[in-house]
């Protein structure tokens, strides 16, 4: 590999398919998509925009937190496990959070939860998601050690905010999180910001990262999976939204941020890397959506498996390599 993965883990059983000979793109889809259908659970209307991580990686296992909209159309979070990263056993019961502190018992009454991300930092798995506070969207924060018991902490920010994504280690001694301040509705605007915290409770030192730039992302953007630390900087996938005559179109691309000051953009791909083109991405509860929430990365080979929600209905997977995507972002950068 030309680009080194920093603080990565070996994943010899990472889900993988070689790039098709006729593929001209830097990211290619799994040929058996979607990997999680909308009706995998008896109560599910849809399962999408979900996050997975290596879990007991020495045993080749994976775990995740899944967005499940039930048949009452409640937005819930469920835990799940897999032996291969493709076939998932999702708990039919939603996560019921225990409170990390007694002071949050009254505040953290469950309303809804969606679009989770999962990030391993130091000794535990941190979960962030769009959480209801007074039925207004903000960033919920919780942690787990085993994906069976989850401890909910203070919300990170005031409403209205979405797309809370943690960095996988402290930077300059502080936890770092992406977010996208928003409004109460289907946000018609949005820039990405970074906030910092000494303790995962009090967040400040907010820094603007970037806003919409090109036509494919001209309406709003938001952070996607957990950033990948490389020798070039932080490799970050993010989604961008075009407002067309037929509604919103959600695509995704990538950028590379400075390693020590991650609010500084070194490279930003001018083009989308994957957009809704397959039937399962274009047709569903919300048409024309590809929404990445997680990656698995093998430090030995540089292989990346990307998990993304499709049409707010199901979960699919795509592939690339660190070298391929870094080279492409650098050679097609708009900054």
From Swiss-Prot:
Catalyzes the phosphorolysis of beta-1,4-mannooligosaccharides to mannose 1-phosphate (Man1P) and shorter mannooligosaccharides. Can also catalyze the phosphorolysis of 4-O-beta-D-mannopyranosyl-D-glucopyranose (Man-Glc), but shows higher activity toward longer mannooligosaccharides. Involved in a mannan catabolic pathway which feeds into glycolysis. Homohexamer in solution. Keywords: Carbohydrate metabolism, Cell wall biogenesis/degradation, Glycosyltransferase, Transferase. Optimum pH is 6.5. Gene3D superfamilies: Glycosyl hydrolase domain, family 43 (2.115.10.20). It comes from the Bacteria. The keyword Signal does not apply. It comes from Ruminococcus albus (strain ATCC 27210 / DSM 20455 / JCM 14654 / NCDO 2250 / 7). Optimum temperature is 45 degrees Celsius. It catalyses: [(1->4)-beta-D-mannosyl](n) + phosphate = [(1->4)-beta-D-mannosyl](n-1) + alpha-D-mannose 1-phosphate. Its EC number is 2.4.1.319. GO terms for biological process: cell wall organization. Both RaMP1 (Rumal_0852) and RaMP2 catalyze the phosphorolysis of a beta-1,4-mannosidic linkage at the non-reducing end of a substrate, but acceptor specificities are clearly different. This is Beta-1,4-mannooligosaccharide phosphorylase. Belongs to the glycosyl hydrolase 130 family. One of its GO terms (molecular function) is glycosyltransferase activity.
């Amino acid at each position: 590999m030309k680009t080194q993965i920093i603080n990565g883990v070996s994943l010899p059983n990472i889900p993988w398919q070689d790039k098709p000979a006729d593929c001209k793109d830097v990211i290619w889809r799994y040929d058996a998509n979607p990997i999680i259908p909308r009706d995998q659970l008896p109560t599910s209307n849809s399962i999408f925009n979900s996050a997975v991580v290596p879990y007991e990686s020495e045993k080749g296992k994976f775990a995740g937190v899944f967005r499940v909209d039930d048949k009452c159309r409640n937005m819930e979070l469920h835990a799940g496990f897999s032996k291969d990263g493709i076939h998932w056993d999702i708990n039919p019961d939603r996560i019921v959070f225990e409170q990390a502190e007694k002071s949050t018992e009254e505040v953290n009454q469950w309303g809804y939860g969606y679009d989770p991300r999962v990030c391993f930092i130091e000794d535990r798995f941190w979960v962030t998601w769009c959480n209801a506070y007074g039925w207004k969207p903000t960033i919920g924060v919780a942690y787990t050690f085993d994906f069976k018991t989850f401890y909910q902490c203070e919300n990170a920010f005031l409403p209205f905010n979405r797309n809370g994504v943690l960095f996988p280690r402290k930077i300059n001694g502080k936890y770092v999180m992406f977010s996208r301040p928003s409004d109460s509705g289907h946000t018609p605007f949005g820039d990405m910001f970074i906030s910092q915290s000494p303790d995962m409770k009090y967040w400040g030192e907010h820094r603007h990262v970037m806003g919409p730039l090109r036509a494919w992302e001209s309406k709003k953007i938001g952070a996607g999976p957990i950033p990948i630390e490389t020798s070039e900087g932080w490799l970050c996938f993010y989604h961008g939204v075009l407002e067309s005559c037929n509604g919103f179109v959600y695509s995704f691309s990538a950028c590379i941020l400075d390693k020590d000051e991650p609010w500084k953009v070194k490279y930003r791909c001018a083009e989308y890397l994957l957009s809704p083109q397959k039937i399962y991405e274009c047709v569903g509860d919300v048409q024309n959506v590809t929404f990445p929430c997680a990656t698995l990365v093998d430090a030995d080979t540089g292989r990346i498996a990307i998990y993304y929600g499709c049409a707010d209905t199901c979960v699919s997977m795509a592939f690339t390599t660190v070298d391929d995507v870094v080279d492409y972002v650098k050679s097609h950068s708009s900054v």
